A protein has these predicted regions:
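Charged, non-catalytic interaction/linker regions at domain boundaries
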Residues: 1-154, 161, 227-229, 238-290
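Residue-level recognition of alpha-helical structural elements
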Residues: 135, 151-155, 172, 195, ...
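Charged, amphipathic alpha-helical oligomerization/scaffolding segments
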Residues: 138, 145, 202-205, 209-212, ...
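Residue-level detector of well-ordered alpha-helical segments, enriched
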Residues: 138, 155-159, 175, 179, ...
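Short acidic (Asp/Glu) and glycine-rich catalytic loops that position anionic groups and cofactors
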Residues: 138, 159, 184-187, 212-216
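Flexible secondary-structure boundary motifs
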Residues: 161-197
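Charged/polar positions within long, soluble alpha-helices
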Residues: 171, 208-219, 241-249
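Histidine-centered, metal-coordinating catalytic motifs and their short helical/loop contexts
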Residues: 196-224
């Protein structure tokens, strides 16, 4: 019976392309199992951010061990005619280019992956207290839940919540302005007013759609919600990837970092970006009056 059970377990795992091996430090069996499950999910959330929502919506931890996803449907039309369909699909995501792994070969990508590994140390060792790693993994969780979420309305809400968890530090007033300025400072590609303002406008738009959704002024099936999902996904992913790189290994390992420290860091970054933009603006030449 034991051999048969082991054989069935092995057959189950053969249905999956990736297997997580998690080592939990200093815990009993029950806590270790729960911690390992959370850590595997945290790693999946990181993969969602690395790969992007478009190629990772079907990724999950565990689930049914199905070799393929077979579905069928019948429809009777008004004239009595019968139409039908059968579809076959794999359990994982498809559509990657052959060289998709090359996206992660650059220096910035390698730094991000290494820093995500540092953040995940918090997930497998409950004794660690690293506030910035915890904050990052929380934000990644909101992003991952948004990717896997079937409801478009819930997706829009969760993507913006990922933004908030990453850049909010207990502030209570003018939240949309604060989030938009910090996201723009993190994600700015070039030091121009246009680029900064574009990021801020996009964040405010995603924030407005989220607010209208949660306060009931728009339907979760409204067309505007799809705009919220698109913006939220792009903004959250860019913010998280840049935060991982800029916080760095030292920040992710810091056990004494506080919300106040992070707020000062964000505010300093916003001021620095504004100063760089100001310095890059050509000054108008002036002539003395005759």
């Amino acid at each position: 019976m034991t051999r048969r059970t082991i054989s069935q377990a092995i057959e189950y795992f053969r249905n999956f392309g990736w297997i997580a091996k998690v080592t939990v430090i200093g815990c009993d069996e029950q806590i270790s199992e729960a911690t390992a499950a959370r850590a595997a999910l945290a790693a999946l959330n990181c993969l969602h951010v690395l790969i992007g929502a478009g190629h990772s919506t079907k990724m999950q931890v565990g689930g049914p061990g199905l070799a393929n996803d077979r579905r069928a449907g019948f429809t009777v039309k008004a004239d009595g005619a019968l139409s039908y369909m059968v579809s076959y699909g794999g359990q994982g995501n498809v559509g990657f280019d052959d060289n998709w792994m090359d996206l992660f070969s650059g220096a910035d990508a390698q730094e991000i992956i290494a820093n995500l590994g540092i953040a995940l140390e918090q997930a497998v060792n409950p004794a660690l207290h690293r506030p910035l790693s915890e904050r990052l993994l929380d934000a990644m969780q909101w992003y991952g839940e948004a990717v896997r979420e079937p409801s478009q309305g819930a997706k829009a809400v969760k993507y913006v919540t990922a933004l908030e968890r990453m850049v909010m530090t207990d502030e209570k007033d003018d939240i949309a302005s604060l989030v938009s300025s910090r996201v723009a400072a993190l994600c700015l590609e070039e030091p121009t007013v246009h680029c900064r303002d574009r990021w801020q406008v996009d964040v405010r738009r995603a924030y407005d759609i989220r607010s209208r959704l949660v306060h009931g002024s728009v339907s979760p099936t409204s067309e505007i919600v799809f705009e919220g999902v698109r913006l939220g996904s792009q903004l959250a992913r860019s913010t998280l990837l840049n935060a991982v790189r800029l916080i760095g290994a030292k920040g992710l390992r810091d056990e004494a970092a506080t919300n106040r420290d992070l707020a000062r860091w964000f505010d300093g970054m916003v001021r620095h970006v504004d100063e760089v933009i100001l310095q890059s603006i050509p000054r108008a030449s002036t002539m003395p009056f005759a």
